[in-house]
C-alpha cells in the first residue's frame, strides 16, 4: 500500500467521528423541540442548555475534521 492511499484511508477513518456528532446534534434539537412542544413556558430555560449542548457536540465534529485534515495534509 502506498503512503498516499494510507493517508486517504486514515483521513476517512478520522472523519467517522463526524457521523456521531451529527446524530448527537439531531437528538439534541429533536428533544428540545419535543420539550418545548410539551411545555412552552420552559422554552427560556431549556433553550440555553440546547445551545450549550449543540456547541459541545459540534466541537467534537470540528476536532474530528481537524484530525482528518492533519492526517491528509501532514
Curated annotation (Swiss-Prot):
It holds the Pfam family ATP-synt_C. GO terms for molecular function: lipid binding; proton-transporting ATP synthase activity, rotational mechanism. The chain crosses the membrane at residues 8-28, 52-72. InterPro entries: ATP_synth_F0_csu, ATP_synth_F0_csu_DDCD_BS, ATP_synth_F0_csu_sf, ATPase_proteolipid_c-like_dom, F/V-ATP_Csub_sf. The record marks 58 as: Reversibly protonated during proton transport. GO terms for cellular component: plasma membrane; proton-transporting ATP synthase complex; proton-transporting two-sector ATPase complex, proton-transporting domain. It is found in: Cell inner membrane. Its main location: membrane. Keywords: ATP synthesis, Cell inner membrane, Cell membrane, CF(0), Hydrogen ion transport, Ion transport, Lipid-binding, Membrane, Transmembrane, Transmembrane helix, Transport. It comes from the Bacteria. Belongs to the ATPase C chain family. This is ATP synthase subunit c. It comes from Paramagnetospirillum magneticum (strain ATCC 700264 / AMB-1).
